[in-house]
Amino acid sequence: MRAGQRVQESIMNVHASALAEAHLPDEQTTAFAREAIEDLSQQPKKLSPKYFYDATGSELFEAITRLPEYYPTRTELAILKERGSEIAKIIPENAALVEFGAGATTKVRLLLNQSRFAAYVPVDISGDFLQAQANGLKRDFPSLGIYPVAADFTTPFELPKAVASMPKVGFFPGSTIGNFEPHEAQAFLRSARQILGKGAQMIIGADLEKEERLLHAAYNDAAGVTARFNLNVLVRINRELGGNFDLSAFTHGAIYNHDRHRIEMHLISRKNQTVRLLGTSFSFRPGESIHTENSYKYSLDRFAALAQGAGWRVRESWTDSAKMFSVHALEAAE
């Protein structure tokens, strides 16, 4: 065993001991703590973007989607409205619509109004937010079977038995696929294909490459909503895990990495500081950052290759006239 491996194992053993002594309330909180400690122990430091999303984080993200600088949501909505009848034609009747990472219901309502779905399965890590959205849909679609699943959609989960015999159509709108590293995106698409089963289809959004000034504005909005969203992961660590991050000592920053075709979001330390979390100390230099999220931007060809590598075929692709955003209909390659 190499010396570096021994040091890493020693560090992880210390962290495991700290977690055992913390008496955290449930498995989800323990998983959050484990990932946070491991990720902050790396160089460069990072935190998983999935932990942006408690009820506050979900509300902040929905606020981001309404910002004038943030083009993806309104552009995708326009595509779904304009191409809704074409999308409906390729969806089997009486199918179950499974939305991975369900948020606000604006987009899914467009699909539900255009197509004759028998059931809707929203899947999201934020259970309270999920249930509230499901209740609103139930009032407007009383004949639709709605079966919320509180789960991390990036890991395997079981669909409700009520939809077992129905054709399955996955729905993954927004630019969330871009938040994964390319190999993680393929792993997610393979997992989704397995969860949805034989004959699966999927409607998925992907942000497209464009001028850097548009990207910079979208992720560094003038109102500072994206900054509050980014900082929410530290708010959660303080509240749920007993951390002592000084929020005023970190600033939000988003940059475009040309070589890797992605926006990178960071929380940047303003000063020399030390933060404690469950018995572990983390030191920061001025300008040192925590890398919190990536948002990869695709060409149509690169996205098609990504999907093909995960066992899907692109049946149809749609874009807006300015080619800012894309929506793809995928079908499982048998």
Task: Give the positions of each predicted feature.
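N-terminal auxiliary segments of SAM/dcSAM-dependent transferases
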Residues: 7, 11-51, 58
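Class I SAM-dependent methyltransferase Rossmann-like catalytic core
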Residues: 45-54, 59-91
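Conserved class I S-adenosyl-L-methionine
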Residues: 94-103
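Conserved SAM-binding loop of SAM-dependent methyltransferases across substrates and taxa
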Residues: 104-116
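Conserved SAM/SAH-binding beta-strand->alpha-helix loop
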Residues: 126-127
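A short glycine-rich, Lys/Arg-flanked "PGG" loop and its adjoining helix->strand segment in the class I
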Residues: 186-198
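Conserved beta-strand signature within the Rossmann-like core of class I S-adenosyl-L-methionine
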Residues: 195-209
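Substrate-binding/catalytic lobe of Class I Rossmann-like enzymes that use SAM or dcSAM, i.e.
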Residues: 214-296, 300, 304-310
